[in-house]
Design a protein with these regions (language model features):
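Structural preference for beta-rich elements and adjacent junctions enriched in aromatics
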Residues: 1-154
Length: 154
């Protein structure tokens, strides 16, 4: 069974992404150009059965830019115009598919910055955190130097 709470995305079952839109590879602390997105297989809509994408807090970084020059309070559900997601559930698991537009990352222009810092983990209340790479005891949830780089191509 899934435990997906948009008000508590850090603990919710889902695919969690950490993105740095201006990665330096030097700072051990997530800054204003870092974003954590929780792609939840359910928890949205009137019946809480719809998938959604939630901007979640990164430890030691509680505010992120909203795109309008102010900080956004977290957690914050991303609007469908910038993040579309679908999900499918089975008795023993779930699958999510998501498309994230550049607007999901305030202050990022893909034409100017084609390299992103990237990390991903599956969060599951029964199984714990399952990181893409690096052991669970590493500080990948808050330290961008533990993330890899994505090079975007045309």
């Amino acid at each position: 069974s899934r435990w997906c709470q948009p008000t508590k995305p850090e603990d919710s079952d889902g695919l969690h992404l950490w993105i740095a839109t201006r990665p330096t590879g030097e700072s051990h602390r997530a800054g204003r150009f870092c974003r954590r997105l929780a792609i939840l297989p359910s928890g949205g809509g009137r019946q809480a059965t719809e998938p959604l994408v939630v901007a979640a807090a990164i430890p030691r970084a509680t505010l992120i830019p909203s795109g309008e020059g102010e900080a956004m309070r977290l957690p914050a559900v991303l609007p469908a115009e910038v993040a579309t997601v679908s999900s499918r559930g089975w008795p023993d698991g779930w699958r999510v598919d998501a498309v994230l537009k550049a607007a999901a990352f305030p202050g990022w222009d893909p034409d100017e910055q084609a390299t992103l810092g990237f990390f991903a983990a599956v969060v599951n209340r029964r199984l714990g955190q399952i990181p893409l790479f690096a052991p669970p005891e590493y500080p990948w949830d808050s330290d961008p130097t533990t993330w890899s780089f994505l090079e975007l191509a045309d």
